Amino acid sequence: MERIVEREVSMKILSFGSLNIDYVYKVSHFVKKGETLSAEELNVYTGGKGLNQSIALSRAGMETYHAGAIGMDGLFLLDQLKEAGVNTDLVKILEDVRTGNAIIQNDEEGDNCIILFGGANQAISKEQVDEVFEHFTNEDYLLIQNEINELPYIVKKAKEIGMKIILNPSPMNEKIKELPLDQINYFLLNEIEAMQILDMEEPKEIDGKYISGLLHQKFPEATIVLTLGSEGSVCISGDEYVEQSIYKVKTVDTTAAGDTYTGYFIAGILNGKTIKEAMDTASKASAIAVSRQGAAPSIPYLEEVEEYKN
């Protein structure tokens, strides 16, 4: 089976993304319109898709640099990143803006719904972007999501340098379509995000092979990884098509499932694994993550994943 990347040089990953404080409420059910609901429990965690994916990459063995912005109330987020081995020198601390945060409801089934406040995540400046990219070369990779501003400029700067770009278009909205998507090297996304990029109406039944095939037709030079929840994941890269089932566990909290998968898949590929090997490792890591409470704290270390038996 083809190995996409042979790691012959020292490469770095720049995760230019969000840094959030997560307020997680344990509830019997998601609150409805007009309803006042008492939470059974409140926990405060570090979060943000950018932070989660940086931690997943680092715990999976990659040299990871995080760029982004926080307010003075978010200094503890830097400690979490540093503890995971992520370089935080490129995170800007803003005195007059609050750190981004998320209000997360977790129900009895382990599902969640999330309200985001952008805060410092929406205060990225072009000057900061210019400063960040001074530290990277065409040997390096950029990972982005959709929780910060200035994404088109970030992609432009990365391409000027010659970096390869990995996109996780979450949360999905019209801003994603403002990006030069034909310049993306890796797409990691779920079926809903994929259908929105394709301007498809949601079908009665999700066909991962069909949807990923349409994406591959639209972006033939990119590697497409489509996550399908309980149905696993599929990947198309060149002429290769691979399917991966999930590892079944008791679900506690799905918040970091996708972020864990993203980090571990990318780390696997860049460390020379085949697509199948990288998908299998990512699925194991994601299974461990959903069996635990919290976002960043639930992301496993590589040693745990390698020892995992279902």
Regions found by a protein language model. Give the residues of each.
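Positively charged, low-complexity intrinsically disordered leader regions
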Residues: 6-33
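Residues that scaffold the ATP/ADP-binding catalytic core of kinase and kinase-like folds
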Residues: 24, 115, 196-198, 289, ...
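Active-site metal-binding loops of divalent metal-dependent hydrolases
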Residues: 19, 49, 260
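Conserved phosphate-binding/catalytic region of the ribokinase-like
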Residues: 3-7, 174, 205-310
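Substrate-binding N-lobe of the ribokinase-like
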Residues: 4, 13, 33-101, 303, ...
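Ribokinase/PfkB-type carbohydrate-kinase core domain
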Residues: 7-16, 79-93, 105-242
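Short glycine/proline- and charge-enriched loop/turn segments
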Residues: 31-39, 190, 242-245
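Short, glycine/serine-rich, charged loops/turns that create anion-binding
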Residues: 20, 71-74, 108, 119
